[in-house]
A protein has these predicted regions:
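Early extracytoplasmic/lumenal segment of secretory-pathway proteins
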Residues: 19-87, 220
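Short, low-complexity disordered leader/linker segments with a strong preference
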Residues: 1-26, 352
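Mature extracytoplasmic/periplasmic domains
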Residues: 258, 267-329
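Conserved C-terminal helix/tail region of periplasmic/extracytoplasmic solute-binding proteins
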Residues: 325-352
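Periplasmic-binding protein-like
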Residues: 196, 201-205, 242-268
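A bilobed periplasmic-binding-protein/Venus flytrap-type ligand-binding module shared by bacterial periplasmic
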Residues: 134-141, 176, 261-272, 291
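A ligand-binding cleft/hinge motif common to bilobed small-molecule-binding domains
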Residues: 84-86, 230-247
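Extracytoplasmic ligand-binding site segments that recognize negatively charged/polar headgroups
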Residues: 78, 83-84, 88-224
C-alpha cells in the first residue's frame, strides 16, 4: 500500500512540476516582420515564454478575424492607423496602464499626440513602427526614379505592374486624380462621386496590373522572378530585395503618398495581459527598435535608436530630415465609410 501511495505521489508531483515548467504562449496577430526571431528570441528567453505569431495581409483581414470570434486567440495585435480608432472604440482592445510601459515616454511626441488610439481619456495602443507606401521599381527598367504615380498607367507597362490588394490603392488613385488637394484628409472621406471616378481610374489601370499582392513576400517574389517592374509597396520589400542583391529602387512621387502608424494593442480577450505589457515595453525600447528596423526597414518610434545607428543608416531612414519626410506622408486615418470603400475596391477587382 505504501508503495502504491508513493507511486501516486510521484505521479502527482510530476504532473505539478510539468505544469509549473510549461511556458506561457503569447499570441500575436501582426504585420509581417513584427515577430521576427532576431528580436523575439531574446524576449522569450528573458520572460520564459513562447511567442506564437500569425500574420495579416490587410487591416480588413485583422478586423474580420477579431469580429469573427477568434479574438481570444490573440493577446497582441498591430492595427494600422486606418482601423486603430475603430478597434479602440468598440471594445476589441483593452485600455492601457501606461505606468506599466515606461518606454512609452520615449516615443516620438508627433506620434503619441495623435488621437488615433485614444477614447474617453484612455490610451489603447502604443506606436511601434511607421512609414510610407512608396513606389518601388526595378532600377534596370527605370534608370531614373519615376516621379509620379501616374506612370503606372503608361501603356508600355502592360502586365508589369503590381498593386497591393488593399484600400491604399484607392487612396493612391484618389491622389492621382488630385482629390487630396488642398486637404489630404479628403482621401479618407471621399464622396460617392469621387469614389466613382476613383473606380473608373483603377479599372483603366487593370491591363497593366499583372497581379495583386497580399503579403510582402509575394511582391518580393514578383520582382525577383522579373514578373513585375514597378509596384506600390512597403519599405520591408525594399529591405528584403536589397539584402538579396536585387536592383530595387524606392521613391515617394511628386503627389506624395499615404502611410501608416502601426500600434500595438492588447486585446480585451487576452489571458496574458501582464506578459503582453512586458512585450510592449520590450519592443519599443531603443535597443529593440534597432533590431526591428533592421528587419523591416520601417521608421522607428523611439528616437533613442539613433545612438545605435551609423550616419548612413540614419540617412537611409530619413532620420536626418525627419520633419520634411513626414510631411510627404499622409498618414492613414479612420475611414468612416470603410464599407463603401471596400465595395468600390471589390468592384474594381471584379471588373473585366
Amino acid at each position: 500500500m505504501k508503495r502504491l501511495l508513493a507511486a501516486l505521489a510521484l505521479i502527482v508531483l510530476g504532473s505539478f512540476t510539468a505544469c509549473k515548467k510549461s511556458a506561457p504562449t503569447l499570441g500575436l496577430l501582426v504585420w509581417e516582420g513584427y515577430a521576427d526571431p532576431s528580436f523575439v528570441a531574446d524576449f522569450e528567453k528573458r520572460c520564459q515564454c513562447k511567442v506564437s505569431a500569425s500574420y495579416m495581409g490587410s487591416s480588413d483581414e485583422l478586423v474580420a478575424k477579431l469580429r469573427g470570434g477568434s479574438a481570444s486567440n490573440y493577446d497582441i495585435i498591430s492595427p494600422s492607423s486606418d482601423v486603430a480608432t475603430m478597434i479602440a472604440t468598440t471594445g476589441l482592445a483593452a485600455p492601457l496602464d501606461l505606468s506599466k510601459i515606461p518606454a512609452y515616454k520615449e516615443v516620438m511626441p508627433q506620434l503619441t499626440s495623435l488621437p488615433l488610439v485614444k477614447s474617453n481619456g484612455n490610451v489603447y495602443g502604443v506606436p511601434f513602427q511607421w512609414g510610407p507606401n512608396p513606389l518601388l521599381y526595378d532600377t534596370t527598367a527605370f534608370p531614373k526614379p519615376p516621379d509620379s504615380w501616374s506612370i503606372l498607367w503608361d501603356p508600355k507597362l502592360k502586365g508589369k505592374v503590381s498593386l497591393w490588394d488593399d484600400l491604399s490603392s484607392v487612396y493612391m488613385a484618389a491622389q492621382v486624380l488630385g482629390f487630396d488637394k488642398p486637404d489630404p484628409h479628403t482621401l479618407y472621406n471621399l464622396t460617392d462621386d469621387q469614389l466613382a471616378k476613383v473606380k473608373a481610374k483603377l479599372i483603366e489601370l487593370k491591363p497593366n496590373v499583372r497581379k495583386l499582392w497580399s503579403t510582402g513576400g509575394e511582391l518580393t517574389n514578383l520582382f525577383e522572378n522579373h514578373e513585375v517592374q514597378i509596384a506600390m509597396g512597403w519599405p520591408l520589400m525594399t529591405n528584403q530585395l536589397r539584402k538579396r542583391g536585387f536592383p530595387i529602387g524606392e521613391t515617394i512621387p511628386k503627389e506624395n503618398t499615404t502611410g501608416w502608424i502601426d500600434h500595438l494593442m492588447i486585446t480585451a480577450a487576452s489571458e496574458h495581459k501582464d506578459l503582453a505589457y512586458d512585450f510592449l515595453q520590450y519592443v519599443i525600447e531603443a535597443k529593440t527598435q534597432k533590431q526591428v528596423i533592421a528587419v523591416t526597414g520601417y521608421l522607428p518610434v523611439n528616437p533613442g535608436v539613433a545612438q545605435y545607428l551609423t550616419d548612413e543608416e540614419k540617412r537611409n531612414l530619413h532620420l536626418d530630415d525627419l520633419d520634411n519626410y513626414q510631411k510627404r506622408i499622409y498618414f492613414w486615418e479612420n475611414v468612416p465609410r470603410r464599407d463603401r470603400y471596400n465595395q468600390i475596391w471589390n468592384e474594381v477587382k471584379a471588373a473585366q
